[in-house]
C-alpha cells in the first residue's frame, strides 16, 4: 500500500523531529499505522504496534540503565525503569515531539483531556514499534531516545528519596492491572519504646504487596512500596489479586 504524497510528507517531517533523515530506511506504512487511532480505523490501527513498542521502550531503558548504572541492583533498576516507561513519562515525550499533530484520529477523541496521557503514551509506543520493526533493531531509536532516558533516570536518582518507589509501583500496577495500589497507614504503638512513627501496607485489590514503617506517613508508604518492588517487580512475579 502506498501513502498519499501529503501524508508521506507529514511523516517525513515527524522523523526529522527525531533527528532522522528522509532517507532513513523506515517502513512508511508502519509509521502511518503507528499514528492511526482506533476511532478512525477499528481494524487497522496502532494497537499491535503499541504492544511491540512497549517491549522496545523497556529494552531501550534497560540498555541505558545497564550502560550508565551497571552497579545498580536489579530492584533499583526495575524501579527506575517502571518510571521511565510509565504513561506519564512517555506521554511527555510524545508531547515534546508533537505526535498529536500527526495522528489520524477523530476530533472528539483528540479533544478528550481525560484520555490525553494514555493517547500520547500509546501513540509514542506505537511509533517506537514501527521504527523497530522497520529495521529489526534499535538503530533508529537509540540515537534520539537514549538521551531522554538517561536524563530522566538521572533526574529520578537525584530525588531526595533516591527512588520514588510509590510512583514506580503505581506505573507498574497501571500497566499490568489498570488500577492504582492502595496504602493503609496506621500509627505505631506509642506506648512501646522506640515505636514512634507509622506503619504502612500497600494493597493491590485484596492482596498485600508490602509493608514498611517510617517517621512520617509518606516515608512509611515509600518503604512499603519499596518492599513490594523487591518482592514482586524485581523478581518479575505477577500477583493475582481480586480487583473490584
Curated annotation (Swiss-Prot):
Superkingdom field: Bacteria
Residues engaged in binding Mg(2+): 50, 122, 125
Domain RNase III: residue ranges: 11-136
Subcellular location, record wording: Cytoplasm
Main location: cytoplasm
EC number per UniProt: 3.1.26.3
Cofactor (UniProt): Mg(2+)
SMART domains, alphabetized: DSRM, RIBOc
GO annotation terms (biological process): mRNA processing; regulation of gene expression; RNA processing; rRNA processing; tRNA processing
InterPro entries referenced in this protein's UniProt entry, alphabetically: dsRBD_dom, RNase_III, RNase_III_dom, RNase_III_sf
Gene Ontology terms, MF aspect: double-stranded RNA binding; metal ion binding; ribonuclease III activity; rRNA binding
Active site annotation, chain numbering: 54, 125
Cellular component GO terms held in the UniProt record: cytosol
Keywords tagged on the record: Cytoplasm, Endonuclease, Hydrolase, Magnesium, Metal-binding, mRNA processing, Nuclease, RNA-binding, rRNA processing, rRNA-binding, tRNA processing
Reactions accelerated catalytically: Endonucleolytic cleavage to 5'-phosphomonoester
A Pfam family recorded for this sequence: Ribonuclease_3
Enzyme class: hydrolase
Start and end residues of each DRBM domain: 164-234
Family membership: Belongs to the ribonuclease III family.
Known partners and oligomeric status: Homodimer.
Function of the protein: Digests double-stranded RNA. Involved in the processing of primary rRNA transcript to yield the immediate precursors to the large and small rRNAs (23S and 16S). Processes some mRNAs, and tRNAs when they are encoded in the rRNA operon. Processes pre-crRNA and tracrRNA of type II CRISPR loci if present in the organism.
HAMAP family the record matches: RNase_III (MF_00104)
NCBIfam families xrefs: RNaseIII
Protein's UniProt name: Ribonuclease 3 2
Organism: Synechocystis sp. (strain ATCC 27184 / PCC 6803 / Kazusa)
